[in-house]
Amino acid sequence: MSGDTGTTSVAPPPGETEPGHGVRIVVEYCEPCGFEATYLELASAVKEQYPGIEIESRLGGTGAFEIEINGQLVFSKLENGGFPYEKDLIEAIRRASNGEPLEKITNSRPPCVIL
């Protein structure tokens, strides 16, 4: 089609669901700590990969950045001391959407970088 601009969304074939459908993510983070920007960045990356996924944010305690997938804690900044890598979270979502068992994300990037 000439003159057609923008992106087109293609629905999955009948009987198939959109990747990430049925997966629910809850991110609990410390707003006074300035972690909202990290949450928004991570949520944007997840939505880009899985447009139909449900992501809920909650305000958490001091230093918190905790991620649950379908009610299971998969990442804790309080335990790891950093933030999750996007690729690790995307992989956990892929596993959840395929019905595979979830493992805790133990890799983390430092909360800040000193130049």
Curated annotation (Swiss-Prot):
Residues 113-115 form a propeptide. Residues 1-10 have a biased composition (Polar residues). GO terms for cellular component: cytoplasmic side of plasma membrane; cytosol. Disulfide bonds join C30-C33. It is found in: Cytoplasm, Cytosol; Cell membrane. It comes from the Eukaryota. Isoprenylation facilitates association with the plasma membrane and enhances the migratory phenotype of cells by inducing increased filopodia formation. GO terms for biological process: apoptotic process; negative regulation of apoptotic process; positive regulation of cell migration; positive regulation of filopodium assembly. A lipid is attached at C112 (S-geranylgeranyl cysteine). The modification N-acetylserine is found at S2. InterPro entries: Selenoprotein_Rdx-typ, SelW_related, Thioredoxin-like_sf. Residues 1-22 are annotated as: Disordered. Keywords: Acetylation, Apoptosis, Cell membrane, Cytoplasm, Disulfide bond, Lipoprotein, Membrane, Prenylation, Redox-active center. Belongs to the SelWTH family. NCBIfam families: CXXU_selWTH. Interacts with GPX1. This is Migration and invasion enhancer 1. It comes from Bos taurus (Bovine). The lineage of its organism: Eukaryota, Metazoa, Chordata, Craniata, Vertebrata.
